[in-house]
Curated annotation (Swiss-Prot):
Family of this protein: Belongs to the krueppel C2H2-type zinc-finger protein family.
Protein's name according to its UniProt entry: Zinc finger protein 18
SUPFAM superfamilies: beta-beta-alpha zinc fingers, KRAB domain (Kruppel-associated box), Retrovirus capsid dimerization domain-like
UniProt xrefs under SMART domains: KRAB (SM00349), SCAN (SM00431), ZnF_C2H2 (SM00355)
Zn finger region (C2H2-type): 415-437, 443-465, 471-493, 499-521, 527-549
GO annotation terms (biological process): regulation of transcription by RNA polymerase II
The keyword Repeat appears for this protein: yes
Main subcellular location of this protein, as a coarse class: nucleus
Organism: Rattus norvegicus (Rat)
Protein task: May be involved in transcriptional regulation.
Molecular function per GO: DNA-binding transcription factor activity, RNA polymerase II-specific; RNA polymerase II cis-regulatory region sequence-specific DNA binding; zinc ion binding
Amino acid sequence: MPVNLGQALGLLPFLAKAEDATFSGSDVIQQRELANPETARQLFRQFRYQVMSGPQETLRQLRKLCFQWLRPEVHTKEQILEILMLEQFLTILPGEIQMWVRKQCPGSGEEAVTLVESLKGDPQKLWQWISIQVLGQEIPFEKENSARCRGDKVEPALEAEPTVEVVPQDLPLQNTSSAPGELLSHGVKEESDLEPELALAASQLPARPEERPTRDQEVGTALLPSLQEEQWRHLDSTQKEQYWDLMLETYGKMVSGVAGISNSKPDLTNMAEYGEELVGLHLHSAEKMARAPCKEDRQENDKENLNLENHRDQGCLDVFDQAPGEAPPQTALSDFFGESEPHHFGGESVPEALENLQGEGTGAHLFPHERGSGKQLGQHIQSSSSGELSALWLEEKREASQKGQARAPMAQKLPTCRECGKTFYRNSQLVFHQRTHTGETYFHCRICKKAFLRSSDFVKHQRTHTGEKPCKCDYCGKGFSDFSGLRHHEKIHTGEKPYKCPICEKSFIQRSNFNRHQRVHTGEKPYKCTHCGKRFSWSSSLDKHQRSHLGKKPCP
């Protein structure tokens, strides 16, 4: 049964960026009894790991924040499930639609779906709300909804107060990314949901001089082509400043602390000269952001081997597809308001891109430059209104294609051992393997003169001389020199026996005991006496037998 969650998911001012929303242990204690469920929800969602507190304290604080948000002492399991489903549904919505739906304070998932469906029939509703937020004005209907969400009483005078609307009512909803109007839709997103690739566009904005804007017609045409010139003239200087602030908030804020780019506004009089370039940069930035790190990796990988390059390029794709710890990817507006033209992903049609993603899944059939350019990322690459940017992009793709054709197949360049023919992923692995043929060792024990290839084996061996046992059992306190011995010992306390014989169903703690037991059923005798050729199933039986050839009596 749906529960009314208007209070729990009502619209409140969003928190700052995720990196700024950190809470210490004292902050959590102060929020023990939160009267506002929305504040508790945002405290839980924005909570970050504190290194100084440690994992146990962090988990305790996170559990407390979760209890404050979901309130299991008040809500039933069905109500808690409804809260989580509604929260996840709102999170995956596009930023513009998400903010609008949260403004309406949906009480359940079904109500949120109804609100989203209503936008399909009347997309003007969303654009009107966006324009009102940009201009800083509210009509009485919006004020009444906001007051009801907060639980305040609506004054009669507020309902009857006339409002002069300067926002055009016939703004068309544009979905083509070649139109700069799409930049407005990105301006109302939360700062934590802004995609990092937009930072490249901010670096192209020139610093704004101290002069005031004079050519209003060019400004209106460059910022929002759907805004008619006649309507742009009716906006005063303050409203135009707020219009630009929205654009700058999208492209400038998140870059100011990283790249040192100024947040100063460019001269609005020159805005028409590069208004179209903003759109081209927005489309072109995702391509360059995906390709740039992979290009640096290729320069390093050429020094080692081509196969390592393959793995690192795949890593670049994984990182670009979904950044860790961030919100789930949001759906594009075009998925709600369909287009007649087919989408293209990295130069491929939708079926071709899906076939590549569902094939090998690793991009092994692509050249490294194709993986780095986002051919499997599903990036929405469309034609830009700037001819120079389109020509530049095509030229870069052509050069990358020529470089890729000159490369030899991957399998022919894998590092291979000349002695045994074994192949490896890295040259470093091949060098280490070759020591087994040459007998070369790097680590020598000063006490017993024993040599080792690996440093980890050398450290374990030294503990036999020093008696050091750093690994302690939590149950009985017994010490062990390595973690493998500790893991085997802990199975005695837990009763875990992961190795089970499929014939007699007998279980064993250690793999070695399980392997010895299987020889009883198979009759395998791998240990052979070098004197008489007799074979044995266990090494201990072979040792006893060899003593008979040497004339020694077995130990009692």
